[in-house]
């Protein structure tokens, strides 16, 4: 009877009861145990009442009991078997792992999408390159056609790069035209000026003995080597002219003066000098509708005015200056827009958009 009573007493003593008895024997309160174990008072109370928290894992619950047993000096081997009988270990719920084949399907689909994306990118790049190449070939063919046309026109015109019509013969004025020369001396006299000298020689002997000086001629003026002898009935001697001619021959050998700078013999001082090539250039450049082009490199050019007449068609060398005048507006076709600068009536013409696009320039200048 005593053995059965002791077994019943052992079974009724749960881990919570034994822990409470040990705590009370040491004179500790639940608050003191909670502070030493760094737990809540409610957790200590649940352990002594053998209440397992539903949201607390069994592993943590066993750990709390072990710490409590060490604090009140109880052996763990006596409490753990009782605890296993009272609250068996619950199996942890583990979520089933996804199949490896599912991950492979995702990777396969992602790889297919990436391949399709790269294919689209390559197609777009290929189309862009083909479009650029076609435009480039078209521009090169157009430039080659223009050059062939220009070469054909040059061969037809005998090597002259500027074919002009009769109405526009003064459109291009030569800037470096030399003065006519005879026997090493400039010949500024025309038929009109020669007759003027002849008539003046009959009226005054001072005209043949001295040359009038203007502001544009230095004091050592040139005198022609040959003496002009007027064909008149005058009996005035010409020895004075011969003497003056001999005196000035030494100065005439070392100086060269253009016809526009030396006044005509026998002409009045208030008569204006004869026009030169420079005056023609300035007049055409400053006229209304003037078109001036400065070339920095070789360039093919074609200029057509409003009447449909071709003012210029050909290749200009670098460093050349082209002055054109016709009826505005002008239609220009330029093979290399970056090789020249254009000004119309003194205002520059913008060619930047053609230079950036690197293509043949077709524009109209002088549109009001």
Swiss-Prot record:
GO terms for biological process: regulation of cell shape. It is a single-pass type II membrane protein. Residues 133-368 are periplasmic. Residues 1-111 are cytoplasmic. Residues 193-221 have a biased composition (Low complexity). Residues 229-243 have a biased composition (Polar residues). The chain crosses the membrane at residues 112-132. Keywords: Cell inner membrane, Cell membrane, Cell shape, DNA-binding, Membrane, Signal-anchor, Transmembrane, Transmembrane helix. It comes from the Bacteria. It is found in: Cell inner membrane. Residues 151-243 are annotated as: Disordered. One of its GO terms (cellular component) is plasma membrane. InterPro entries: Bact_Cytoskel_RodZ, Cro/C1-type_HTH, Lambda_DNA-bd_dom_sf, RodZ, RodZ-like_C. GO terms for molecular function: DNA binding. Residues 19-79 form the HTH cro/C1-type domain. Residues 30-49 bind DNA. Its main location: membrane. HAMAP family: RodZ (MF_02017). PANTHER family: CYTOSKELETON PROTEIN RODZ, PTHR34475. Cytoskeletal protein that is involved in cell-shape control through regulation of the length of the long axis. The helix-turn-helix (HTH) motif in the cytoplasmic domain of the N-terminus is involved in the formation of spirals to maintain the rigid rod shape. As this protein is anchored in the cytoplasmic membrane, the HTH motif may contribute to protein-protein interactions to form the RodZ helix, which is localized beneath the cytoplasmic membrane. The C-terminal domain may be critical for determination of the rod shape by probably interacting with enzymes required for synthesis of the peptidoglycan layer, including PBPs in the periplasm. Belongs to the RodZ family. This is Cytoskeleton protein RodZ. It comes from Yersinia pseudotuberculosis serotype O:3 (strain YPIII).
